C-alpha cells in the first residue's frame, strides 16, 4: 500500500528541488536520447504559459507550484516532487489546475489517476482540494462521423479515437465545466474546461505559437509505452526504476518537468 506524508509547497527556486532536477538531468543523459520537440510539443508548453496568464488575470495564483512529498511503500520513504501547472489557495481551500493540449480525448483518462494522487497529497495540507483540467483541443474528433472518416483514411490511428463526450460519460470522476467559476465548486470530481486552438491564439497571438503541425503529422506513429504512475521529477532512492520518457502527443510528465524547468 502506498501512502503519502510530509507535503510542502515550494517555489522552483528551492535549492533541494533544483538539486534533484539536476541529478535527474544527469541520469537522463546516460539513457537514450529524447526526440527533438515537435511543433505540437512546443505548442503544448506555449499553451500552458498562455492559460496560466489567463488564469492569473482572473484569480490570484500561488507561486509555490512545486509539491514536495514523501511516498511511503514497503516501510520505505522516498522524497518526490511534482509540478502543479497552476494553483490558487483561498483560506483552507486549494484549487489545482492541470493544463493539457491534446488531439485525443483519451488524454483525460490518463490525467485522472495523477490528479487524484495530487489531490490526496494536498488534502494533508488543505481540507478541500478542487482539481480542474484545462484541455486545449488540438484536433479531437467532433462526431462519430469524423471518427469514421479518420479510421477510413490512408493513415488511420492504431486504435479508434474517443469522442470528448464518450470519455466524460465513461469516467465518472470527470465533470464538464461551462466556465471557470463552475470549475472549482467540486472537491471530489475533476472539472474539465475546454479551450480551442483559436482561444489560445486570441490569448497569446499566433506569432508566439508553434502552429506548423504538418511535419508532425507526417511522422510515423510511435508505439505506446507504459506511462509513469505520477508526475515525478526525481526520487531520493537509486533503487527506484526510471520511468519511460516517451509517449504520444500528450505531455509526458517527466519530459514536461524538464521542459518547464528549462533543463531539456
Model segments located where?
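Compositionally biased, charge-rich terminal segments
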Residues: 17-21, 241-248
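Short acidic, low-complexity intrinsically disordered linear motifs used
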Residues: 246-264
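Long, low-complexity intrinsically disordered regions
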Residues: 220-242
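Intrinsically disordered, low-complexity Ser/Thr/Pro/Gly-rich regulatory segments
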Residues: 1-228
Amino acid at each position: 500500500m502506498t501512502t503519502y506524508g510530509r507535503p510542502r509547497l515550494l517555489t522552483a527556486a528551492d535549492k533541494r528541488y533544483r538539486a534533484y532536477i539536476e541529478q535527474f538531468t544527469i541520469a537522463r543523459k546516460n539513457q537514450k536520447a529524447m526526440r527533438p520537440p515537435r511543433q505540437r510539443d512546443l505548442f503544448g508548453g506555449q499553451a500552458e504559459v498562455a492559460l496560466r496568464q489567463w488564469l492569473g488575470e482572473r484569480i490570484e495564483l500561488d507561486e509555490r507550484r512545486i509539491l514536495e512529498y514523501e511516498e511511503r511503500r514497503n516501510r520505505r520513504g522516498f522524497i518526490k516532487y511534482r509540478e502543479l501547472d497552476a494553483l490558487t489557495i483561498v483560506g483552507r481551500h486549494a484549487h489545482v489546475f492541470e493544463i493539457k493540449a491534446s488531439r485525443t480525448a483519451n488524454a483525460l483518462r490518463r490525467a485522472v489517476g495523477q490528479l487524484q494522487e495530487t489531490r490526496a497529497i494536498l488534502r494533508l495540507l488543505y481540507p478541500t482540494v478542487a482539481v480542474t483540467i484545462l484541455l486545449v483541443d488540438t484536433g479531437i474528433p467532433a462526431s462519430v462521423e469524423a471518427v469514421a472518416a479518420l479510421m477510413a483514411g490512408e493513415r488511420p490511428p492504431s486504435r479508434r479515437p474517443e469522442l470528448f463526450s464518450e470519455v466524460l460519460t465513461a469516467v465518472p470522476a470527470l465533470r464538464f465545466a461551462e466556465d471557470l467559476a463552475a470549475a472549482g465548486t467540486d472537491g471530489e470530481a475533476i472539472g474539465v474546461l475546454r479551450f480551442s486552438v483559436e482561444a489560445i491564439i486570441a490569448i497569446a497571438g499566433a506569432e508566439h505559437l508553434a502552429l506548423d503541425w504538418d511535419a508532425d503529422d507526417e511522422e510515423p506513429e510511435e508505439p505506446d509505452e507504459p506511462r509513469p504512475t505520477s508526475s515525478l521529477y526525481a526520487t531520493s532512492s537509486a533503487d527506484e526504476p526510471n520511468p519511460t520518457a516517451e509517449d504520444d502527443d500528450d505531455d509526458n510528465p517527466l519530459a514536461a518537468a524538464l521542459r518547464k524547468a528549462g533543463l531539456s
